[in-house]
Amino acid sequence: MAKMRVRLPMLILLLGVVFLLAASIGIAYGEKDFTKNPPKEREEEEHEPRQQPRPRQQEEQEREHRREEKHDGEPSRGRSQSEESQEEEHERRREHHREREQEQQPRPQRRQEEEEEEEEWQPRRQRPQSRREEREEREQEQGSSSGSQRGSGDERRQHRERRVHREEREQEQDSRSDSRRQRNPYHFSSNRFQTYYRNRNGQIRVLERFNQRTNRLENLQNYRIIEFQSKPNTLILPKHSDADFILVVLNGRATITIVNPDKRQVYNLEQGDALRLPAGTTSYILNPDDNQNLRVAKLAIPINNPGKLYDFYPSTTKDQQSYFSGFSKNTLEATFNTRYEEIERVLLGDDELQENEKQRRGQEQSHQDEGVIVRVSKKQIQELRKHAQSSSGEGKPSESGPFNLRSNKPIYSNKFGNFYEITPDINPQFQDLNISLTFTEINEGALLLPHYNSKAIFIVVVDEGEGNYELVGIRDQQRQQDEQEEEYEQGEEEVRRYSDKLSKGDVFIIPAGHPLSINASSNLRLLGFGINANENQRNFLAGSEDNVIKQLDREVKELTFPGSIEDVERLIKNQQQSYFANAQPQQQQQREKEGRRGRRGPISSILNALY
């Protein structure tokens, strides 16, 4: 029994030794197999497609990398200091090789420029957080070398799409900001004109429809403003339109020829001359000046369609076709009693026939090649102006000829400005159109006093100068028609002020009944077309003459205004000027006081400076 007790511990010890030996042999065999081909890597090789051969240097790096992963995956056996130092050394080598590969990797110049351009919208690539992510990223970079062109194309396409979206967002923001700035539906800046025609000799521009932005101007939907400009010694070719015109010469000189079935009328026009051109009348305008450009403003009243007008030219140029080309061959042959080939050569301008004719005449360029506005010679100008008449002088305008807006005395005038007006009862040309013409001159630093028109709606064109204007409207009307707009004055809930700066080429509207004042920061010239002008009355709200507030009964003034009747009377009579006044009287008085102080002499000036 005692022997059994001794042998039992020895047997257990032997079994333990055998178990340890077996475990050691198994671990060693597993390490050897794992080093040759790790299971995880075998699975990846079975599932992943065969890749292109990799550089030897990279294979060595990956072999070192797998060896380090093996040590990381083993049971905690404890590492020696030498193994840790070797691992750090391998890590430094891998980092060095990785940097060298990135430096040597070729990248197209276009790709670099796109990456620099895409910095705003593409996030920076982050450093991998683990060795596996680092290895996968390196393999993706190597695998993407074959499809770099495709990838760069996708990136360019994505970049273009994002850039387009960004531009659309910017345009939307700009339009919103423009809509916020453009709270005044009665003001049209000069850039609201659309170019109808342009060549090297001149241009024709048309202002957008007045009711395009707001329904407050529906009564003006059948009126359009057109601006015509031409260089010296040029002619706009003959045409007729399905609209009545009132044209005014703003700058330069012109000779206009009006052709009727039984006669031809020729007029010389100067600055300020106006003329009605009936619908369907064939006409052509010449700029005979050698140095000065011609600038004409026209009010168009279309006949067929509200707000739409069409020009019809008998000639064919590179910009438009002749209305003869709309007829059939048989109709043209019967109309001109000749063969169609002759009609095509002479009137319609067949390209091949024109080229032959040009070579026969030895001309480098015909008038048809220039377009609607063509250059003319000195001899042609003399012939066109031979029988021209001038505009009527002072007195009542003629029934058909031109007249000058400033030929008669101004109806309002003082040292600060002048106001001229031609009403339908004075000018028979405008009676059936129910339109008046005004021309206003406001000197620099002057103010056209607040006033309103009883019936007429005025379309005003800024001919020259700069300034600003203020127009008063009613809040209820504005809220019904545009509820999204905010009030300018939170404290004044009954009225709204529309104000804008004025510059050359701008157009603004003065609705009937809306009080208005205009301030000139430089000499300001304004051309006005009054719509529904019959029996219109202009009522001033300040000044010594034509002041409707001044005409109120004394008792009514006391009931109307919060101040005492004495203060109201004194305030109304305080403005000694009529129609036009100084825009900054208080500042002028201050300057006059300072000027009187300056005349005290040098002693007083020195004392004032010291004390």
From Swiss-Prot:
Role description: Seed storage protein. Accumulates during seed development and is hydrolyzed after germination to provide a carbon and nitrogen source for the developing seedling.
**Where is the Cupin type-1 domain positioned along the sequence?**
186-344, 403-569
Compositionally biased tracts (Basic and acidic residues): 32-82, 130-141, 152-181
Q: Where is the composition biased (Low complexity)?
A: 142-151, 390-402, 580-589
Organism equals Lupinus angustifolius (Narrow-leaved blue lupine)
A GO molecular-function annotation: nutrient reservoir activity
Q: Determine if Glycoprotein is one of this entry's keywords.
A: yes
Enumerate composition-biased segments (Acidic residues). 483-492
Short name of one Pfam family for this protein?
Cupin_1
Recite the lineage of the species: Eukaryota, Viridiplantae, Streptophyta, Embryophyta, Tracheophyta
* Protein origin, superkingdom: Eukaryota
> Annotated region Disordered: where?
32-194, 384-407, 476-495, 580-600
Q: Which family does it belong to?
A: Belongs to the 7S seed storage protein family.
Segment forming the signal sequence: 1-30
Q: Which InterPro entries match?
A: Cupin_1 (IPR006045), RmlC-like_jellyroll (IPR014710), RmlC_Cupin_sf (IPR011051), Seed_Storage-Functional (IPR050253)
Q: How does it assemble?
A: Component of globulins complexes which accumulate in seeds.
Q: What further fact does the record state? A: The variability of the residues taking part of IgE-binding epitopes might be responsible of the difference in cross-reactivity among legumes.
Official protein name in the record: Conglutin beta 1
